[in-house]
Amino acid sequence: MRGEVHTPGGEIIPLPEFTAWRLIHTDGRSADSFEVRFPTREDLLVRLLRGVNFYAVDGGATVFCGVVDEAEAIWADEYTTTLCGRGLAARLMDNQAGGAQFFNLDMNSVLDRYVRPFGIGQIRVEGGPWRTQMVSVPAGCSCKQVLDGFCRLVGAPQPRFDPDGTLRIARGQGSHILGEEDLLSAKWRLCRYGVITEQQVHDLTTGAVSVVRDPVLESYGIRSRRFATRSGPFTHVNERSARARIAEAARDLNTLELTMPGGYSARCCDTVRLSLPALRAEEDYVITEICRRFDGLSETTRLGLRAKE
């Protein structure tokens, strides 16, 4: 695997072949991340200090786009440089929005105001039309929080970045079947902490109270209630937001971590059908994280999964 970094002035600096690397892609809840290591000449090291954008290429295909957060050089007979950073979501996370209130706001307006100005031009939105009659943006929240919050409000999929840097607002379409013979290891986890089973929304304008419960989560023996207040006549939006908050809080209730040899071809949000009798995991899961790693000797792929809703 090789890569290159770009400077603010447009200079493209090719990098030597990586001696070790780790690429992590997520479903958009957090930023993707990378760490690569390679031998360096002293003249290249000086140029690398100006690099801000990072691209990794494997087999002729772009497998990661991101920003360089940190560079480290070690000298012992020769220079070895380590670059690490985040995916393109970092551009949205590092820029805050001013306070604003919108009426009849649609997805394209959100992208024009909070996404495209930060150099993110490749965008694919599926479904919709995604719009809401009223939304407030608190001052000081990040542009990523604005985009994520709008998508939750209107019921759009969670935004995420493809390996080639495309911002995708769409549901996963890939499907995979995995069994014990495909894995090096598997870890199952049940975590009830933070799970919400009931969300009440109090409308300050009408005095109405909407209650949303999840009987499936209650069957786990969990009793956890949250309150929220809203104003305005959009009760259906409040209830939809309540369901979204319950679903978001339950994301980590039932999770799996699978490790496989080599590089496994998959995308975050793809569906995985598992057959792991030893862990009593014989159902559908959704990929939330993909970590490809090469330690200098062998390559492995780790998949983070959550139970499919």
Label each region the model flagged.
Residues M1-P8, P39-A73, F103-P117, P261-D284, ...:
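Short, acidic/charged, Gly/Pro-enriched secondary-structure junctions
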Residues M1-Q96, R152-G155, R160, Q173-R189:
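Assembly/oligomerization scaffold segments
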Residues M1-V5, D148, R152, R160-L297, ...:
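Acidic, small/polar-enriched beta strand-loop surface segments
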Residues F18, A31-S33, V63, E78-T80, ...:
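Extracytoplasmic
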Residues H25-E42, Y79-A90, V201, D252-M260, ...:
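Oligomerization/assembly interface segments of phage tail-like spikes and tubes
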Residues G51-N53, G98-N104, D182-K187, V216-E218, ...:
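Short intrinsically disordered coil segments
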Residues T80, C84-Y193:
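Charged- and aromatic-enriched interaction segments used to assemble
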